[in-house]
Amino acid sequence: MIIFKNLILKISSLRFAISLIIFIAITSGIGTFIPQGSDNKFYVDNYNSAPIFGFLDGEKVLKLQLDHVYTSFWFLFTLILLCISLAACSFRRQIPSLKASLKWIEYKSEKKFSKLQLNTSHPINQDGDHISKVDLLLKKRGWKTYKFKSHISARRGLIGKIGPLVVHIGLIILLIGSAYGSFTSQSKEQYLLPGESLDLVNESTNSKANVKLVDFSIERESDGIPKQFISKLNFYSEDLNLNEIKTAKVNHPIRLKGLTIYQADWAISTVVLEIDNILYQLQLKEIPEIGNQVWGVLVELGSETKNNFLLTIDNENGPLKISNIENFSGENLYLNDDPLEVNSSKVSLKKVIPSSGLIIKNDPSIPFIYFSFILIIFGTIISLIPTNQLWILVNKESQKLSIGGLSNKNLVGFKKEFFKLSEQIKNF
């Protein structure tokens, strides 16, 4: 029993909770640094030759489950331990503190008033119902009072005592929701060309929906740097009686029927070329060896002798660079411009078709996450409300009215109010 109590004391301590939070923050940072969810070969190939921090090679990454940090047993165990720590702290400290603050404390002796943060006294006449007058004044000022025969206990701002408990509940819901989302969330990245569609199935409701990319555009700065990617999507579903068009932008996802669709990326998927009076629609692939966001394709050009040429492009407005793979000399081909003669073939660029990179995510834990943040914000705000307490004692033998006060926050502000009330009571 003693061991169990000592364990609870340790788990519910602030130092222990802070240690867990720091550990979670560090491991979460590692999870963003190391790519998550790739196959084992990726980690072995990339980290055996260049270990992380000089000692974490591919085998150690896999063994320590750093390839899936957020669903690893040790990360989830830490979340559970933090939940237990917060719950233990709530039951051991917050709830008893709240219960204690609900009890009315009586100060029947003038000696006790000298120990309070603020105290003063005034002479009174034996005649007059001073307690009733003070009680009425305090109630008008928004104080909750408990009147006795010769003394009054008053308090205000008790809701501030609930704040830490609400924050703890919000954090527990956040941790549980995060763990739940790690196992239940589904995510899919899809590139769509204008006119292409994607069928979505919600397994929990067995409902189907079709998402069609109506239009995709890119806003650019004056220097050509991408500013915003915009996808106009049509959602259609007979099961859900749905047919509407919504717009997804970077940092402005679409939320619909439990799904969240993010505008995540873009690509140049296709170019339409006219080669010797024949139209060709060529599929492009990203070529990271040449540069960031450069797409290209290898084609044969020439009416008599065929030679290989590399076509590359990095902007939906062009130009398309045509390079000879032997010496990488090349020319730029502009959109809807005059044809270029390349190895005796006439080539013109008719159309550049960019595709929209979308991430479609189904995360049942989102409502829990949002609700937890609401609780945390609400709890933090109300915890800033000071809890003030007043005691008034009438001693007819010494013909003195004593006033004392306590405040857990903003003592300066409470001090001003305290002496203002004292002057009003003095005038009785």
From Swiss-Prot:
It comes from the Bacteria. It holds the Pfam family ResB. Keywords: Cytochrome c-type biogenesis, Membrane, Thylakoid, Transmembrane, Transmembrane helix. One of its GO terms (biological process) is cytochrome complex assembly. InterPro entries: Cyt_c_bgen_Ccs1/CcsB/ResB, ResB-like_domain. It is a multi-pass membrane protein. One of its GO terms (cellular component) is plasma membrane-derived thylakoid membrane. The chain crosses the membrane at residues 14-34, 72-92, 162-182. Required during biogenesis of c-type cytochromes (cytochrome c6 and cytochrome f) at the step of heme attachment. May interact with CcsA. Belongs to the Ccs1/CcsB family. This is Cytochrome c biogenesis protein CcsB.
